[in-house]
Each structure stands twice: as structure tokens, then as C-alpha cells.
């Protein structure tokens, strides 16, 4: 009898978890176009992720010496290209002459927006890379924010979800004041907890991108009660993807989009995953 009760309890628990997983949707998006599988932040990477079924992307934007917006993560060129020096002190033409370490070309915002503009069901995080802060004094920061916002919104498909994100909260505050209603996300290198939730609320943003290690299900539930949308990072492995889903994240980045999608389809078909 005890054994039968245990089996029934286990079945009921599994059914409960499965029902919850089916009700909860997690959107997985391609971080820098899937930097561990493809040539990060290049048009080739975004196309490869799109071809794999992804409609969610994260991109990093910096300002060149002559005022153009380039898609790149680091403030320096050495890690990802055959060039050297600081992005913000290099002209767009100089950057266009470089090759990435995988033989590609650096992407610029206009070509990315042109590629996105006819696509349906997009979710794109435009991360404002305005650190080191000495490269972006207030006047330069405002020029950067205005140009980025205006270019992105002028080319936004009607059904797209475009979000401006940053770990430099100066840009978030400026956009919020200048463009009321803009969709903003605070990025933090700390886990989701009481302090980071309070910080997001104080900034007046509706989204928080928190580090997954140290984040609990209770913290995610509290953030949801506070009206916050939760995005978790990093996404290096399929285990990271599973942890993000377990924690109850709304969004989750991944550096391995193809591997994660294959894993989810084959191993966790009960999860309600959107790409």
C-alpha cells in the first residue's frame, strides 16, 4: 500500500511539474548571434541563428570615432579582430578594413536593422556598451543614446519587441527621460535578489537581466510580483538553459543556440520554449 501511495504521489508530482512547465514560457535568444558557435556579432552569426529557428537576438552597440554605430562587444579590437586599439578611437572606415578572427567583417547598425526590418516575431536586445565611462562623457553618451534610439525605432517592425539594455545606468536614465515609454532593461553582474530588485524599481525599468548563479526561484517569483520581467545569464551550456527554465526566467540568453534548441526538442519537449 505504501509503495502504491509513493508511486501515485510521484506521478501526481510529475504531472504537476509538467503542467507548470507547459504553462510557463521561456524565450531563449541568441547572445551575440551565438558567440560560441558562430562569429560573434557578425551578420553571418545572426543569419545562422535565424536559419536555426531563432527570432530572438542580443547585440552590442558602440560608437566609432566618427560617430557611426558598430556592432561589437569589447571596447578594444584585439580579442575579436586582427586589429588593435580602442573602438571608440577608430573610424568606421578603419573598422571596415578589419577582419574578425574567423575571417568575417564587423557589422554596423544600419545593415543589421535593414536585415531585421522585414522579419516577423522578433525579440532584440540592443545592449548599450558605454563603458569604460571615460570614453562616453555625458555629451557623447547623449549623442550615442539619441542616435541609437532613433535609428532602431525608425526601422522597427510593427510586431517586434525591441529592448534597450545596459549595465551603465546613465544611458537608461537618459532614454527614460527623453523617450517616455521606452522599453528598458537593467543588466547586473549580481544575482536576482532583494537589492537588485530594489535597484530596478528605483530606476523605473520593467526588466532586469541578472546573473544566474545565486538567483533563486523565490527571487524570480518576488520580481514577478513586483511587475518585473526576468532575463537570466550566462548561457554557456545546456545545463545553464535548464537552470534558467527551472528558476522560472522569462528570458534566457544562450551562446550555443543550435545546441540548446536541439537539446530542448529532444530532451525536454514538455518545456514551452520560444526562440
Language model segments and positions:
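Phosphate-group recognition and catalysis centered on beta-loop-alpha active-site segments
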Residues: 21-275
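Bacterial Sec-dependent N-terminal signal peptides
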Residues: 1-24
